């Protein structure tokens, strides 16, 4: 039967190996089975293939602590949490909060520990940032100022359109490789509910306007305002405003934070549709599935409910 070795026994193994003793002789000397010695050496060898007793002992302690941590969480609960990670790509915080609403207790720290201890790296692939957070300096885009006729500044937007009431939207366009493909994205600010569709004619303002009208027409009564940036693709904003009976406001130049809801949503989309990808390589069904997955994610701001649930609660 396998026994946990002490530091003294590990030191004795080291001395035995140096003395060219057989595994059987070492096992007899420290009163353990030969299989225990064999497993110990295979499990704790260093990069050169040798056995370092001190490193072996530290690694064993770390493994033991990890097992103890995971042992506190019943296996079915851990499996349920990891299923949400792998199938839904939710963050540990989202998983923990969602399960808590179901009466199931598991901390996000426990989930993070399991991810870090997964030597295959498979679990890490389902974490949005791969547990690495890099801060890049923002570069100002070298674009010519665009004059959008009759644009209304965000500073004229009513105070109540602060993201807390239902019906205030943000609009954007994400571009594919070489700016030859695009996807229109719309986000309802209070619920983070996302609507996204491929734009067949990239940066064509009239086609974009008609597409946005089609996307939001089913929710026309729930479109109080739309906020967007100063891209030339939004030049036909008056056509959108007229057909949806709404008001459209434009952010200041280089002020992406003024439409933070759609900016953050676009980052979630990039988990599935990365930068540099030609959108013509993906299907409309894949785009719909991406929208579906993002709308199903529980959010902290929604008390770990999903945007889909809270959005359609307003219609019940």
PLM feature spans:
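Short, basic alpha-helical/linker "hinge" immediately adjacent to a nucleic-acid-recognition surface
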Residues: 1-89, 93, 97-98
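Mobile genetic element proteins and their domesticated derivatives, centered on retroelements
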Residues: 13, 37, 81, 95, ...
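Charged alpha-helix within mobile-element recombinases
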Residues: 19, 29-31, 78, 87-88, ...
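Basic, flexible linker segments flanking DNA-binding modules
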Residues: 55-59, 106-161
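Two-metal-ion RNase H-like nuclease active-site motif
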Residues: 166-176
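Active-site beta-loop-alpha junctions of metal-dependent nucleic acid enzymes
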Residues: 175-179, 196-220
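Short loop/turn microsegments at loop-to-beta-strand junctions
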Residues: 181-183
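Acidic/histidine-rich, metal-coordinating catalytic segments
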Residues: 221-236, 254
